[in-house]
Amino acid sequence: MAVGEKEHEGTVVESGGEKNDSAVVLSASGEKKTTKRKGLFSRLWNAIFRVRGDDFEKRLKNISKEEATVRNRMKRRSITRRNFIRNLIAFSVFFEVIAVSYAIMTTRDEDLDWKLRSFRILPMFLLPAVAFLLYSSLVGFWRMCDRRDQHTLEKLQAEMLGKINELKERTNYYITQQLIQRYDPDPAAKAAAATVLASKLGAESGLKVFVGDESQLEPTAGKNNAKHSGGLRNRKQTNTRGNSAETTPIHHSDNESNHSGTSERITGTEQNQQMVFEHYNPQEYAAHDGSWISRIAALLVGEDPSQSYALICGNCRMHNGLARKEDFPYITYYCPHCRALNKPKHSEEHSLIAPADTLPKVSLKPMESEVINSSSSTSERGNSPIPLLHTPEIVEEVPETAENETPN
C-alpha cells in the first residue's frame, strides 16, 4: 500500500512539475476539458491583421433581429387596423340604426318643444361624426407609426448593406470571385462568380445585367426573327395574289428577305438534312387526275394542265401541288406533311452545268404560304388532303439562262 501511494504521489508531482499553458475547465458533467491558450505572437497578429469577423457577425445578427422585430410590429399594426376599421363600421351602422329608430319613436308627438325634439334627434347626427373623427385620428396615428417603422427599416437595411460591403472589401471578396471565374475548373463555381461580378457591375453602373446561357437565348431570338420575316413574306405574297390575274405556281422571294433570314434557313436545312428524298417517279407525272372539272378550271385561267407536273413527296407520297414542266427539274421543296426535303434526281448534273458560285442557292426554313398555286392547282387539290395554307416551300436552283427563259 505504501509503495502504491508513493508511486501515485510521484506521478502527481511529475504532472504538476510540467509546465503547460492549457487551462483546465470543468464541464457540467464533471469532466475536465483543457483549452489551449494563444501565444503572444498570435495575439499580436490577430490584433493587427484580423478582420474582426465576430464583431461583423454579432452586428449583422443584431440588425437582422431588429429588422424582424420591426416587420412583426408593422404586421401586427396592420392586422389591428383592419380589425378596428371593420368593427368601427359595424358598430357605427348598428348604433346609427338605433339612433334613427329612437328619434322616430320619440318625436311622433306634435306637442314637443323644438329644443327637446332637437335633443332627441341629435344622436342620429352625432354618431357618424364621432365615428369619422375616431377613424381619422387612429388611422393617422397608425400611418405615422408605419412611416417611422419604415424609416427605421430602411436605416437597418442600409446599415446591413454597408456592413456586408465593408466585409467584402476587407476580405477581397470580388477579387476572389474574379480569380475563381478565371482559374476554377468547376463550371458551376465559374457561373456563380460571373453572376456576382455582373451584379456588382450592374449596381455600380445602374444597368440590369443578365447572366445566362447564350444557347438558351439564341433559339428564341431565331424564332422571333423567323416569325417576323415570315409575316413580311406572307403579306407581300398576299398583295401579289390580289394584284395579278394570272398567278404562277412559283414565286421567287427577293434578295432582301433571303439575306435577312439566312441564319434561320440554314438552321432549318440542318434540321431536315436527315430526310432527303428524290421526286417520286417524275416520268409518270400526269398533272391532272382525270377529272374534267379540274381541266376546265385550269383552261379557264389560261394554264394547260398537260404541261404541269404534280409534286409528290418521295417519303409520304402526298400530293403537294403543281409545277411547270420546264421548272420541274430545278425544284427543291419541303413536304408540309412529313417535313422531308424533295430534290430532283439529276441535281448533280445540273450542279455541273451551273457552278455553285453562279447559282442563287437558297435554303428556306419550312414556312407557310411560300408557294402560291394557281386556281388550277387549287382545283387539283380537291382530292388532296393538303389545305391551301400548307403549300410546300420551294427552293429553286435555276441557271441564268433558265431564269431568262422561264417567266416569273
From Swiss-Prot:
Region feature (Disordered): 218-265, 367-408
Example of a GO biological process term: endoplasmic reticulum cisternal network assembly
Record-annotated disulphide pairs: none
Family under the similarity heading: To C.elegans C05E11.1.
Name of the molecule in the record: Uncharacterized protein At2g24330
One annotated GO molecular function: ubiquitin protein ligase activity
Pfam families (alphabetical): Zn_ribbon_10
UniProt biased composition (Acidic residues): 394-408
Low complexity bias locations: 369-379
One GO cellular component, as annotated: endoplasmic reticulum
